[in-house]
Amino acid sequence: MKKNIELFLVHQNDSLKQVMQKIDHNGHGIALVVDSQKKFMGLVTDGDIRRAIIKGISLTTSIEELMNKNPTTLNTNYTPQNVTDIITQKPNLNHLPVLDEEKKIQDILLKEEIMNITRNTSSLFSKIETSQQKIELSMKQKRILITGGAGYIGSVLTRQLLEKGYNVTVLDKFIFGPSPLESIKTNPHLTIIPGDVSHVEDIIKAIQQVDTVVHLAEIVGDPACAIDPAATQQINYLSTSIIATACKHFQINRFIYASSCSVYGSTIDEELLHEKSTTNPLSLYARMKLESERTILGLADGIFSPTILRFATVFGQSPRMRFDLVVNTLTLKAIKEGKITIFGGDQWRPLIHVADLSRAITAIIEAPLEKVKCEIFNVGGNQHNYTINHIGEHIKTLYPASDVVIQEKNIDKRNYKVDFSKINTQLAFLPSLTLQDGITEIATSLQQGNYDNYTNSIYYNDKWYEQTLKKN
């Protein structure tokens, strides 16, 4: 099937920045360079441009100076054997422009089409399969950097993306240790970079060879952020600003920022809060999220195209388990101590399972850039707004031996119901896992003897950060 070739065409005098914009929009990591008569001059990839930027070449430079002037091409009379002969010699080739006698582009074969052709020749396919540079069967071209990829959300997202065939790079300081990625560290499509998002040199190293960044690496949660306010501002705001600026400079234009529904603070009369509702952050954590959102969106220029995701409160099992999240905590208390203590209880919280949250991030990665550029999405489901009392009641119903105690002290002021219609309408995303699913999986795991060391500070962000600060 022929493509809309115009999506790939750039003029030989176009700048690197203009060409990168075209590459981002066609979504295939390549542009075809033509002259004023639309005759083929060469091709360039996003990787070529990013390597040039690292070398100090200006974004205003003409693409003619950078393009590959002698790429492998096909003529319009090509046969499947022509394609297989080429791929035998160049098994990592992902694109083949098809030219007519006048050197005008008639089509371009992309990765999946090349594989479909070569699969019909079993002997060739065997050679490709055994090659160290074998071609992947899916069209997944994106190379994803996840900062905080060993964290509660990141370790789940990393696995989901690897299962879908993506190449994933993780930049993580590993303050909670390496165990969350231990079982997948030998995956050939995973690159692990121990590093700190506060260090520019680590950022520059990590963003090379990627075209999408998911930024998760921050101090997470109100109590943890309150321990060292200066460090929170440095990591959650200043470092976030630096990594976003670096991505813009190096033309990594699909940037996904993990914000939080806590930026809304408190709902009025149980109003459903949508993306344009007034924000009212009640903590340093929430304020830094909101400031980061504004700074990141302020960097958008029509080419750098960030997306802001305001996460609902997360629950469920993860390779980097946490027991300082409301559903996880109350379930733990019910199973291990037989008692659930709720402070207040009338506060509303939107909830989402960590696996569903990772699915939502993947949906943003896979969406056409025009659908998600410079957008803010609440991430969750309307049916998953609960009061803390509702959560306690669900646990009590599932595990009736546990007692529920309500205390009218130390009441959390955060109270918000959130509207998630936008992400459902624009991206057809809905959570698939229920509150009951999350409670049951955690309870079952606890009953099987997992997390017997549940009091260990490693499961609680604030305790672990405080302990780490004392050590340092």
Which ranges hold each PLM region?
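Active-site Tyr-X1-5-Lys
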Residues: 266, 280-307, 335-336
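C-terminal substrate-binding subdomain of Rossmann-fold SDR/epimerase-dehydratase oxidoreductases
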Residues: 338, 342-472
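Flexible, glycine-rich beta-alpha linker
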Residues: 264-265, 280-284, 307-325
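The conserved cystathionine-beta-synthase
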Residues: 9-28, 34, 53, 73-94, ...
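N-terminal Rossmann/SDR dinucleotide-binding element
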Residues: 127-212
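Conserved Rossmann-fold NAD(P)-dependent oxidoreductase catalytic core, especially the SDR/UDP-sugar
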Residues: 241-284
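Short beta->alpha transition motifs characteristic of CBS
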Residues: 11, 25-28, 32, 40-54, ...
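NAD(P)H-binding glycine-rich loop region in Rossmannoid oxidoreductase-like domains
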Residues: 197-235
